[in-house]
A protein has these predicted regions:
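Acidic, polar-rich N-terminal leader regions of halophilic archaeal proteins
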Residues: 1-88
Length: 88
C-alpha cells in the first residue's frame, strides 16, 4: 500500500492522484490539509467562509490540536510524522 492509500484508509482522508486531502472544521476556522507523496510534505490551506476559496497558511498559524492530529494520522499511515513540520 502506498502512502496516499494508507492515509485514505483513515477517517476523512480522500485521494486525489498523488495527494491525499482531509478537511477540518474548528469552531471558527476551516482548513484543508494536503499530503503530497512525491515531495513527502504537508500543506495547510485555510478555507474561506464560502468554502470555495482557500489560501496556503504557515503551519505556525494552525492550531496545535490540528497539527497533532495530522501527525497522528501520518504515524498511523506509516509515514514519518516529521514531514508535518518540514519547511516547503
Amino acid at each position: 500500500m502506498d502512502t496516499v492509500d494508507a492515509l485514505t484508509s483513515l477517517e476523512g482522508w480522500h485521494a486525489e492522484g498523488f495527494a491525499a486531502r482531509v478537511h477540518y472544521r474548528g469552531a471558527d476556522d476551516h482548513y484543508s490539509i494536503e499530503y503530497y507523496e512525491p515531495s513527502d510534505c504537508i500543506l495547510y490551506w485555510k478555507v474561506k467562509g464560502d468554502g470555495e476559496t482557500a489560501v496556503p497558511v504557515g503551519r505556525e498559524t494552525v492550531p496545535d490540536p490540528l497539527r497533532k492530529r495530522i501527525r497522528q494520522d501520518l504515524t498511523e499511515a506509516g509515514i514519518d510524522p516529521d514531514v508535518e513540520s518540514r519547511v516547503v
